[in-house]
Amino acid sequence: DLSLSPRGRELERRLRDFLQRRVWPNEAAHADETAGARAAGDPWQPSPLIAQLQAEARAEGLWNLFLPDSPRAPEGLSNLDYAPLCELMGRVYWSPEVFNCAAPDTGNMEVLARYGSQEQQARWLDPLLDGRIRSAFLMTEPDVASSDATNLQCAIRRDGDDYVIDGRKWYASGAGDP
């Protein structure tokens, strides 16, 4: 059965309503804001519009919908219930950020939630879930086709109580993108 759960249907309705009221009407304003930041020589500055919409989305319970089965994100959904929400959010390239559902943060938060120590979760996962920081996933390496995240040469090994990461990364841009 690929039907949405009652909760999934309700969140889809609420998300569609939020997008219609707050995101879709602001596409031109976001484009103007982005163009202004670029013209001012600061393309990576945080967007005041997105910050405002994030506060509204959080207040309406439309925050961290992607993370299933986590005590830190009880709003989380199954992949089946989350998929139609992604489709709706995907209509505007920047809207997943409004709901704290943007890559690479979503994948990095999932990894931290599943495998991170309590210390790592407190230091990195909690601020990511709160939307206070952003993360990066740098998979570019000089000797492999790095658009495939399973095709990495970088290696990690245990050395006593520590881990040693050994590898080279290629230039990456956008790491400063809030």
Q: Predicted regions: what is each one?
A:
Residues D1-A103, E119-R134:
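Amphipathic, small/basic residue-rich leader segments at the start of a protein or domain
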Residues A39-G41, G76-L77, M109-E110, S146-A149:
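Short, solvent-exposed polar/charged micro-motifs at secondary-structure junctions
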Residues E75, Y115-P178:
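Glycine-rich, Trp-frequent "lid" loop and neighboring beta-strands that shape
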Residues L85, M89, N108-L112, I156:
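Buried hydrophobic packing segments
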Residues F99-E119, D148:
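N-terminal glycine-rich flavin-associated loop
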